[in-house]
């Protein structure tokens, strides 16, 4: 639908954008705010640090338990989720749906889905799932869940107002992350 409905050449270099009336109006409303771009960039790095932390946790389980078969199934599922994020990213870098609404110095760059939004939402929502299962202290559990939720919310809102993606690209990142999370949960609890 993104490449069929209301497609118009409103992007840089006359690039075609789906849902052009909606995307164009929202982009004109918000403009470009590189401060929010930088803030969400830092939050994305924080999300990657969380993913690395779970990778180290899996390595710790392997060393402590002495066997690949003794590493928790949900940690393997988490590794699968992270690989799936990478595959989706590469897929949409090759099968371009929309280009960014602004030229960031590298010419036309793919914008759908907002990979930053997808990555942050996937990592943080899977972290929430892990923390709810693993943290015994209710206060610490609630704090980590709140922090993860805040990182996701600020990333989504920040990417919306940064102006480096079309609105539908950010929505696509959120929807793809929700889909990937459902596959992760199904694999983790089997």
Regions found by a protein language model. Name each.
Residues 105-190:
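Membrane-embedded catalytic cores of phosphoryl/pyrophosphoryl-handling enzymes
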